[in-house]
């Protein structure tokens, strides 16, 4: 079963995901949005769709593992899209219904904010 680390920006998700991966001996899927948008100064709706596609491909590559630690997943992209653009494209809903069984750990922003070019 996969464990998804989710929550608002600067709440320790990536740190917790890396720690759990090491502690439990499960593969870590890092946040796809961070990899994809790393050098960009902005993004478009098409970028979020591409991030979802890449994230889904990476999740499928882990399908044979007994479980994985995911530093965010489709849920984060769905919330992001709704906040920025409104109603979700059907492909996000389809991806939500196709996902594997998961446990969600929700982080809260009770640690100091760390500025980052990708944070809004």
Identify the function of each model-found stretch.
Residues 5:
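Hydrophobic anchor at the beta1->P-loop junction of P-loop NTPases
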Residues 13:
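Conserved lysine of the Walker
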Residues 66-83:
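A basic- and aromatic-enriched beta-loop-alpha substructure that forms the phosphate/nucleotide-
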